[in-house]
């Protein structure tokens, strides 16, 4: 009897506590994830560069980072699980410097690397297939790599390429076409473009007919200012036929009244969609952009429509500091998708045109020291002490971040002087002042960069492109401080990477981060020259290069708490690659592909 009572008593206790136990277990079980990636090599780029196996993502954020076994605890009925099968995962690439609107237009049509008429015709066919009738085809930039026996991309040629406009005449009959050589020494047009300015391209007396057309526009009072047919040379072949090519100072003014000053909004929308597709296939999940205000509006429009597949850090010009301040914009303004609060200024020119500012003259042009930009000079081009500093002081006082272009050694030194004065007048604080490009730095200025807490916003692929002619222009001694990434890092400055996409009219800088990583760790051209690397003591490790392309750019944007590494609570932005970047040679980087890009927990590239 006692045993039966005791058994009943125990059964009652068990029955009463079992629901409690199950409830406790449910409380301990995590909410299901939307997506789990398992069995990978997950390089987190956290404080200790942890390598792990899996991540779980919910509502666009990482909720778990760790072992594949533990990740499966986040599996629910609707959770998608992807077996990575050992593939390499790292945070999405954060590009520190792009000109997105220009890149979007460049992607639409460019023949910078075209070497044959077949390539030219194929690219014309492609752009025609994507444009509504009547839209102008512009851009081009042919011949940029003809000047090199072997360009940094291996695409250099000895024979000059000139597009055959007659070969695309039928293709482009519904599209006026006005394209340019990379140095603006020559232009090419089709018949539709000529007709747009009242010129009959079939007239055997073409210059005479063109002159008559211009005179008629003068009589009608519709001639654009500066139009002058006398400044246009119509190029002909050996048989005397017009080739479609033009030269001369009057070419631009001849077409100024008919070429659209800006693309339509719909065209820019489509260009942006195409450019977003381009960057996500290379694992880029965040860009720092210096485009116009319409581009910012387009980002917002796409975000509202759910089509924005990259995060945007947007930078207007430094001269607009008061406008930004009056609108209440400061560091941190915006949200996780579109962030404002930084401004872009310029100190000097660029190496490509020998306008970067140096203490000593250029080795190949000793009287030329380069040029200061407009915010540094008066209306006559004379240097004005303190003019640029005034902009810095005011913008800084308004709570805005400054990012300033400086390339030559004098430009970088002067900018560091200004930063020291900024600290003296406005006080020392966490500004994360971004010294943009920092291409050539004097030996004594590296320590100052670290002491001042500078963020060096560099684009390593510039190195692979520029090393071909750098010593010719500034000599070997000054070149020791060119793209000196190791010296910058060792100084204590923060090194962050990007591309300067799409480049200039003379050089293309692709958005592909693998090219920048390759340049930073090898210091070679893409053809592998020189064998040991150009000033190889300035090479950095792969882990440092990856950090510069991920976490450090997030830090530069004041966003390291929400992005830049694979950690719980951060936004789920990542890239899955075909190769383990930590275990391959620099050359293998050039064959490494991105098989999946995830932004905010959504797969935007790959399966």
State what each model feature region is.
Residues 1-6:
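N-terminal secretory signal peptides that target proteins for export/translocation
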Residues 7-21:
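Bacterial N-terminal signal peptides
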Residues 24-25, 602:
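Boundary of Sec targeting at the N-terminus
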Residues 25-38, 43, 47-326, 341, ...:
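Divalent metal-binding segments
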Residues 99, 337-355, 453-464, 522:
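Non-cysteine beta-strand/loop elements that form the S-adenosyl-L-methionine
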Residues 303-306, 329-338, 426-428, 449-453:
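Acidic (Asp/Glu)-rich catalytic clusters
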Residues 393-403, 410-433, 437, 443-447, ...:
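His/Asp/Glu-enriched, well-ordered alpha-helical/loop segment
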């Amino acid at each position: 009897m006692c045993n039966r009572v005791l058994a009943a008593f125990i059964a009652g206790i068990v029955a009463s506590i079992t629901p409690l136990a199950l409830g406790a277990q449910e409380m301990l079980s995590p909410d299901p994830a939307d997506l789990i990636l398992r069995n990978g090599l997950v390089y987190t780029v956290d404080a200790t560069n942890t390598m792990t196996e899996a991540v779980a993502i919910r509502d666009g954020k990482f909720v778990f980072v760790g072992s594949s076994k533990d990740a499966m605890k986040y599996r629910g009925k609707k959770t998608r699980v992807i077996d990575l099968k050992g593939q390499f995962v790292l945070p999405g690439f954060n590009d520190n410097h792009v000109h997105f609107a220009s890149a979007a237009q460049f992607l639409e049509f460019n023949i910078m690397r075209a070497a044959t008429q077949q390539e030219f015709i194929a690219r014309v066919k492609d752009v025609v297939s994507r444009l509504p009738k009547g839209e102008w085809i512009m851009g081009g930039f042919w011949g940029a790599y003809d000047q090199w026996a072997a360009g940094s991309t291996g695409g250099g040629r000895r024979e000059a390429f000139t597009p055959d406009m007659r070969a695309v005449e039928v293709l482009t009959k519904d599209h006026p076409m006005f394209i340019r050589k990379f140095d603006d020494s020559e232009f090419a047009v089709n018949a539709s473009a000529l007709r747009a300015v009242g010129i009959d391209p079939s007239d055997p007396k073409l210059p005479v007919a063109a002159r008559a057309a211009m005179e008629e526009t003068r009589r009608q009072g519709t001639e654009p200012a500066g139009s002058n047919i006398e400044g246009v040379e119509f190029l002909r072949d050996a048989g005397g036929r017009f080739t479609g090519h033009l030269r001369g100072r009057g070419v631009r003014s001849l077409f100024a009244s008919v070429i659209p000053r800006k693309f339509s909004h719909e065209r820019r929308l489509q260009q942006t969609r195409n450019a977003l597709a381009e960057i996500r296939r290379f694992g880029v999940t965040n860009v720092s952009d210096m485009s116009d205000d319409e581009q910012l509006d387009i980002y917002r429009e796409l975000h509202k429509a759910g089509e924005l597949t990259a995060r945007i850090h947007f930078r207007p010009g430094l001269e607009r500091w008061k406008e930004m301040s009056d609108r209440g914009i400061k560091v941190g303004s915006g949200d996780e998708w579109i962030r404002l609060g930084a401004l872009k200024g310029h100190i000097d020119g660029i190496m490509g045109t020998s306008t970067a500012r140096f203490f000593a003259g250029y080795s190949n042009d000793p009287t030329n020291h380069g040029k200061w930009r407009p915010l540094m000079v008066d209306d006559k081009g004379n240097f004005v002490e303190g003019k640029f500093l005034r902009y810095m002081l005011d913008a800084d006082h308004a709570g805005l971040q400054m990012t300033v272009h400086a390339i030559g050694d004098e430009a970088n030194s002067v900018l560091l002087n200004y930063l020291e004065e900024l600290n003296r007048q406005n006080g020392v604080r966490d500004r994360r002042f971004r010294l943009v490009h920092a291409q050539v730095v004097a030996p004594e200025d590296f320590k100052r960069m670290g002491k001042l807490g500078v963020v060096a916003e560099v684009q390593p692929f510039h190195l692979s492109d520029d090393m071909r002619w750098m010593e010719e222009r500034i000599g070997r001694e000054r070149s020791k401080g060119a793209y000196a990434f190791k010296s910058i890092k060792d100084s204590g400055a923060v090194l962050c990477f990007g591309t300067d996409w799409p480049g200039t009219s003379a050089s293309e800088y692709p958005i592909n981060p693998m090219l920048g990583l390759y340049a930073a760790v090898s210091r070679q051209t893409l053809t592998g020259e020189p064998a040991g690397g150009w000033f190889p003591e300035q090479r950095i490790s792969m882990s440092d290069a990856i950090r510069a392309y991920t976490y450090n750019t997030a830090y530069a944007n004041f966003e390291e708490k929400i992005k830049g590494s694979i950690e719980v609570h951060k936004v789920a932005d990542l890239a899955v690659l075909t190769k383990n970047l930590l275990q391959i040679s620099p050359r293998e980087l050039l064959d490494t592909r991105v098989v999946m890009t995830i932004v905010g927990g959504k797969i935007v590239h790959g399966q």
